[in-house]
Curated annotation (Swiss-Prot):
Segments of skewed composition (Low complexity): 100-110
Topological category with respect to the lipid bilayer: Multi-pass membrane protein
GO cellular component assignments: plasma membrane
Main location group: membrane
Stretches with biased composition (Polar residues): 24-66
Subcellular location: Cell membrane
Family: Belongs to the Casparian strip membrane proteins (CASP) family.
Organism per entry: Arabidopsis thaliana (Mouse-ear cress)
Cytoplasmic side stretches: 1-121, 183-198, 268-270
Protein name stated in the entry: CASP-like protein 4A1
Amino acid sequence: MEELEKTQKFQKKKKQQQEKQDQSSPINFEMSSRSSLHSLPQTTIESPPDSPTLSSIPDSHGSSPHTIIPTPSVAKTETPFRVTNGEEEKKVSESRRQLRPSFSSSSSTPRESKWASLIRKALLGFRVIAFVSCLVSFSVMVSDRDKGWAHDSFYNYKEFRFCLAANVIGFVYSGFMICDLVYLLSTSIRRSRHNLRHFLEFGLDQMLAYLLASASTSASIRVDDWQSNWGADKFPDLARASVALSYVSFVAFAFCSLASGYALCALRSI
């Protein structure tokens, strides 16, 4: 009897243990599943810019702690950009640095090159006229010595000496400028607009034009005064011829100064 009671108690204990194990098994399974979910690596899914993004928030009904619901997203705007190579950047920088248009032979139009060539030839013609008139003027003035019944000479009057000196200076300057223009026309070289050539040429042409004008005026006044005092003679006639040629030199230098002034104002190489 005692053994039967012991066996019955033992069987009851086994049944109780089995029931406890059966009750604890679903809890352990749920805990293990939760731990496995947390241990998995989190992966992010990139959504297109127009589709709504997804965010995880806990469900209010408590069905699962990781319920995924859509949320609206803000569209991203990208600023457009342009890829340029090094050559284009250099061209852009050079065009920004360049403040004045270039008047080189490659960029000039046929009309501009023809106009520049015409001005060169006209300037050369005026230089030749000034050169010849100055040469003849001071030659006639130098030859006016011991002429007429009075045997008077030009070096006795400062007005005639002044006219002689002005024509000599104009003769030398015109000779140098003629050589320069002939060289430019023969080699077809355009002058640089960055040097002081145009400023010097315009300034010297103006100075010589005013110098010849004042010298010719003073010499002509002296000739009229001599003739009013002593009458007509060979000496004042030669002096008058020299003064007339000096006026021609003044007109030639005036036109040369106009051409050089155009080159200075237009900043072109002629």
